[in-house]
Structure formats: C-alpha cells, structure tokens
C-alpha cells in the first residue's frame, strides 16, 4: 500500500499501485488536465508509470521548468513524426533539448529548405490537432535494437549498441512513429501547442568532422502562446541588434575565409577598441597593476610543464623552427609566471599584480565561429595576482569592486555572480580548498551580493567566481572571472621567501574583467544597437555645411575640435543638408553640428543628436560643455534635449 506525500505535506494511502495521472485526477480536474509528468522521490516519471512504494511526489505541469523541458523533448519526437511522414527515407539521429528549444539531427539526401521547414511545421500542427496519446513501452535492449533495425534506423541502432546489455530502453510511440528516450514525455499531443521551427544547419554525426554531415533542424517550444510570442519578439530584437550586421553597416570590422576566426578591424572599429583598451589600462594603473608583454610563440616544453599540452594540445596552433616545436599561446598564464620567476621575491613584495593585453590563439572548430563572439584570435584583458593564502580574500574583494566599477561604466547594472567549487578530480588538499572556497564566499558575502554556487564546476586547480552581464534584452553574457590556482605556480617553479626565510609557492589568481576585447565589443555593439555613447563612439562629432560657402568654416571647426581631443570630421559635399543629416544619423554619430550662413555670421553651431533631438544654436564653447558632460558619463549617458 503506497503512501503518497504531496508537496504541501498531505498524505494519501492507496491499496494498489497508483499513477501520477490518477493522483492528479483525484486532486481535481484542472490538475488532471494540466499534468504532463511527475516527480517521484526526486525522479521524473511519465504520468502513466505505476508507483508501488511510499513516495514524495510533485505533479509537473507546463508552469514548471521541468515541464517546459519535457514539452520541448516531446516536440523533438513530434518533429521526427512529421519528418518521417513527409520524407519516409529520412534517417533520425538524435533530438535533445537545448536552451529555449530543441533540435533533431537528420540524414536525408536533399537539403531542407525554408519551404520544407514550413511544410514540416504545418504537418506538426496537423498532428497536434489529432490529440493522440503518446504511448511509452519499456523493452529489452534486444527488442529495441530489432525495432529500429526493422525500420532501417542505423543511427538509433548505433546508440543502442553502446548501451549495456542488461539495461532496458524506453520506446515512445507517436502513432506509427517510434523513438527512444529516457523520458518522460507528455501523455498526449494536446500539451504541445506553442512552438516554431527556427532554422536548419549542418552538424556532424556525434560532433566528429570525420563522420557524415547531418541536417539539424532547430525549434523552440513553450508552455503558452504568450511565452512563445515573447520569445520570438526577443529573437527579432536580437537579430536587429546582430553585431555582424551593425558592424558591416557602420564599417567597424569584417571577417573573411582566408583568415577564419580572425578580425579585420576597420578604422572606426579600431577606434572603439583603442578607447576600450585605454580605459582598462588607466583603471589597472589606478589599481596597482603592472603591465607586461610576453611572447606569442613559446616552446612546447613550457606548455608540457604547465599541463596545457596534455589538456589543450588539439586546441593549440603550433609551428616549428630549427627542429623545435612551438605553440602560439592560447593563454597568458605560463608566461606571466616566467616574469614572476625573474629575481628573488619576498613575502613583503606580495601581492604582485601582472597585467597584459595578451593576444591569444585557439583552434576553435570552424562551425563554432561567430563574428566577434567566437573567434580564433582574441585579446584578453588578462592579469595574474601572485599572493599568499592569507591575501586571497582581500585580493578577491578588491577585484570584485573593480569588476563592478568597470561594468557600471558601460551601463551594465544587472550582474549575475556564481561561485564554482571543487570538482571530483583536483589538485591540492581539502584544507586548501576549504580555505579558498571560504575566502571567495566571504569576499562575496561581505559585499552583500546575491550569488549562487555551481557545485563541482571549479577547475582542477582551484575554485572560481564568474561574473555574467544581463543585457537590455535579458541575454546573459559570462565575462569576468577570478580563479584560484594552487597548481601552475608549483609546476612552473614559482616561489617567494616567507617571513621565516623559507621558500614557499605563491597562490596565483587568474582574473579578467572583459574576458576578450573582441567578444566584449560584440556585446557592446548589440547592447547599444550601434548607438555608442559619445565616449566610445568612433566619430563623436561631424560638422555639416549647408552650402559651399560654409565649407571652410566646417573644416576649421572640425580641426579645432580634433585639436581639443574630440574624434571629429566634416561633410562639405554638395548635397542637400537633409540627406547629409539622415546619412550621418544612420551612421550613429552622436552629435551633428550644422553650419549655414546664419551660424557662420553669428559664430554659432546648430546642434542635433543621432536620436533626432534638435538642441538649437549655441556657441562652440557651450557645445563643448555638453559633449564633455556626455563623455564623462561614459556608458550611463542618456540623450536629453537642450537644457
């Protein structure tokens, strides 16, 4: 007689095994209609699975996160059902849940087009309307293998062959279509309503470029039409802000096939990069960091000593010279230890903070490259702090202040903080890990920040704190980190003399604020939609003449502004002034100074902003006060009418 305990503590006793569907029906018709799965003693199960033991249960609906994932997984199977009806020769591979949706990898002789996606989506909608039950059957490995062998589903057979012989396999049946999965899935297609197929792309079977290329159809699915529409609106907004499109439109950068994953910075894009670098450099100087520069290529022996050769060899670019093998550095830390190792260090010298705008190369798969966001060559705002164990908390605390100051300068207010703790495989004693994790947690708690743990997600050499930005359309970008390292200083022979004249190994803190310049600029392009605040804008001011008579004055004012440190230019083309204003507004130039005969005679400029605000006529000195204030606000600048 199973005793069932509900989330509110209420208990129900049954004389025979009972299912989630039956329990939900007893509680009420509304819950019975909404139930899509159950959680039994912490394990997710289908609504039809009998419960024969005492259990704590939770009934899962589309309002639960688990429920949304179940809906998405069920949609993947429904996609498979529709594909096999429309394209019987297609072979189904895998169809997992991903963030905000699902995908299915499919082998098919023809390339799926957008028209094909529309037809598949229509067939899915037709199947949903049939409100059929999804039937689950648990079978032996042998029966599952025969089922898919009979259906000529070679990819499913490959997966089954890797499952231990004594395991059972769940088959989920959508009418004539059969798929396999751990489950659970929705009990009926009536729970599958809000979805959209998004795109199709190529994907290698099992992610291995030596295997055949499959076609991956992506979809999104939600618990309600309202949630789906909100997500599609967010996707539309993200596409509008795509840094690759804006970068091309504003002539900031480009990539090309001859240098995959490498950025060609154009003058305006490089201007943004230089402003960013100068800002970070000034900030580091004020926080007692010493800037260094280390080599791009280093003999493989150093990477073997540091441990990178064993773990990252496949991701490293290498070259040879005079029978020696070199790696183009994928990270800066081993080289920073070489700088620390030059000369004897005392405990009185610590902490030592070494910073570098280090150019790194990593051999990312070509299919993963994405504009500025995922590249093969990138520059990190990298630094390493060499300190004692006792100094960890204080150094972390100072770095947290630094991170928040920098992010605030760009206008980011919502910061998500996570602390990654010790993994199963690690170096260092439990005592050192205890101290380090406590030091990081205490540093966060003293600041009274909200944060959460990522258990087991730390590196093998130490725990870390991750700082992620939430942008204006609620996307999360992981940028800053500070990570404790007990291993590498020891491996590479770093040491200092302590107060007892004994040689000791320093702790090394890896830290970055932006992560990489390329990716952070990509984030900024999308955050600002190319409408950079004046301090970052490649061109801060353009002086526009109304007629040829104003050309000389335009050039004079532009040159004067440049001499005073502003990024200024002029437009004296023989075009209508309205056309010129429109063009430069579309180029997102913050301030447009218009000069006609009246302004030239009065010694004034007429000021407009890229946001369409007419600030009226004023003396150049008055305009300088306005732009100086705007620049001083950095990323917190907001366009306002003339005061």
Curated annotation (Swiss-Prot):
It catalyses: tRNA(Thr) + L-threonine + ATP = L-threonyl-tRNA(Thr) + AMP + diphosphate + H(+). The keyword tRNA-binding applies. The keyword ATP-binding applies. One of its GO terms (biological process) is threonyl-tRNA aminoacylation. Coiled coil: none annotated. Zn(2+) binds at residues 333, 384, 510. Keywords: Aminoacyl-tRNA synthetase, ATP-binding, Cytoplasm, Ligase, Metal-binding, Nucleotide-binding, Protein biosynthesis, RNA-binding, tRNA-binding, Zinc. One of its GO terms (cellular component) is cytosol. It comes from the Bacteria. It is an enzyme of class 6 (ligase). Catalyzes the attachment of threonine to tRNA(Thr) in a two-step reaction: L-threonine is first activated by ATP to form Thr-AMP and then transferred to the acceptor end of tRNA(Thr). Also edits incorrectly charged L-seryl-tRNA(Thr). Pfam families: HGTP_anticodon (PF03129), TGS (PF02824), tRNA-synt_2b (PF00587), tRNA_SAD (PF07973). Residues 1-61 form the TGS domain. Its cofactor is Zn(2+). Its main location: cytoplasm. This is Threonine--tRNA ligase. Residues 242-533 are annotated as: Catalytic. Homodimer. Belongs to the class-II aminoacyl-tRNA synthetase family. PANTHER family: THREONINE--TRNA LIGASE, CHLOROPLASTIC_MITOCHONDRIAL 2, THREONINE-TRNA LIGASE. Its EC number is 6.1.1.3. GO terms for molecular function: ATP binding; metal ion binding; threonine-tRNA ligase activity; tRNA binding. Binds 1 zinc ion per subunit. CDD domains: TGS_ThrRS (cd01667), ThrRS_anticodon (cd00860), ThrRS_core (cd00771).
């Amino acid at each position: 007689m199973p005793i069932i305990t509900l989330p509110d503590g209420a208990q129900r006793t049954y004389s025979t095994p009972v299912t989630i569907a039956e329990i939900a029906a007893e509680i009420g018709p509304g819950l019975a209609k909404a139930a899509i799965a159950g959680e039994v003693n912490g394990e997710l199960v289908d609504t039809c699975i009998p419960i024969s033991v005492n259990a704590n249960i939770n009934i899962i609906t589309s309002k639960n996160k688990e429920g949304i994932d179940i809906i998405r997984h069920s949609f993947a199977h429904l996609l498979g059902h529709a594909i096999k009806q429309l394209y019987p020769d297609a072979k189904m591979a895998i169809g997992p849940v991903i963030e905000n949706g699902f995908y299915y990898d499919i082998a098919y002789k023809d390339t799926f087009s957008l028209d094909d996606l529309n037809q598949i989506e229509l067939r899915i909608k037709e199947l949903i309307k049939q409100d059929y039950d999804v039937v689950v059957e648990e079978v032996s490995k042998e029966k599952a293998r025969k089922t898919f062998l009979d259906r000529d589903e070679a990819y499913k057979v490959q997966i089954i062959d890797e499952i231990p012989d004594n395991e059972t396999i769940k088959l989920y049946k959508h009418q004539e279509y059969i798929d396999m999965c751990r489950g659970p899935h929705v009990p009926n297609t009536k729970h599958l309503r809000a979805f959209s197929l998004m795109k199709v792309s190529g994907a290698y079977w099992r992610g291995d470029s030596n295997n055949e290329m499959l076609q991956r159809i992506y979809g999104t699915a939600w618990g309600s039409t309202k949630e789906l529409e909100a997500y599609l609106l967010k996707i539309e907004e993200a596409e509008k802000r795509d840094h690759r499109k804006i970068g091309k439109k504003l002539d900031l950068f480009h990539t090309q096939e001859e240098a995959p994953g490498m950025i060609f910075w154009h003058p305006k894009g490089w201007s943004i990069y230089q402003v960013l670098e100068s800002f970070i450099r000034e900030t580091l100087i004020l926080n007692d960091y010493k800037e260094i520069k280390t080599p791009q290529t280093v003999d493989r022996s150093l990477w073997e000593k540091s441990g990178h050769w064993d773990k990252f060899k496949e991701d490293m670019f290498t070259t040879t010279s005079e029978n020696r093998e070199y790696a183009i550095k994928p990270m800066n830390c081993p080289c920073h230890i070489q700088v620390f190792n030059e000369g004897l260090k005392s405990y009185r010298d610590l902490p030592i903070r070494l910073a570098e705008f280090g150019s790194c190369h990593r051999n990312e798969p070509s299919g993963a490259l994405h504009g500025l966001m995922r590249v093969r060559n990138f520059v990190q705002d990298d630094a390493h702090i060499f300190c004692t164990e006792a100094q960890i908390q204080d150094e972390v605390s100072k770095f947290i202040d630094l991170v928040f100051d920098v992010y605030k300068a760009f206008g980011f207010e919502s910061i998500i903080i996570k602390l990654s703790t010790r993994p199963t495989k690690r170096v260092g004693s439990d005592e050192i890990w205890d101290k380090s994790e406590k030091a990081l947690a205490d540093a966060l708690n003293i600041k009274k920040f909200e944060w959460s743990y990522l258990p087991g997600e730390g590196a093998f050499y130490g725990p870390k704190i991750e700082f992620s930005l939430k942008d204006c359309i609620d996307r999360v970008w992981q940028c800053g980190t500070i990570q404790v390292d007990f291993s590498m200083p020891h491996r590479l022979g770093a040491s200092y003399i302590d107060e007892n004249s004994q040689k000791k190994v320093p702790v090394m803190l890896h830290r970055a604020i932006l992560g990489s310049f390329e990716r952070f600029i990509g984030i900024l392009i999308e955050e600002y939609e190319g409408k950079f605040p004046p301090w970052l804008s490649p061109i801060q001011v353009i002086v526009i003449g109304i007629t040829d008579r104003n050309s000389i004055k335009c050039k004079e004012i532009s040159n004067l502004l440049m001499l005073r440190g502003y990024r200024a230019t002029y437009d004296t083309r023989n075009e209508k002034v309205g056309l010129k204003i429109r063009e430069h507004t579309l180029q997102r130039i913050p301030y447009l100074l218009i000069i006609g005969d009246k302004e030239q005679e009065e010694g004034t400029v007429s000021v407009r902003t890229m946001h369409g605000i007419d600030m009226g006529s004023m003396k150049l000195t008055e305009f300088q006060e306005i732009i100086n204030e705007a620049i001083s606000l950095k990323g917190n600048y907001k366009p306002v009418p003339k005061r």
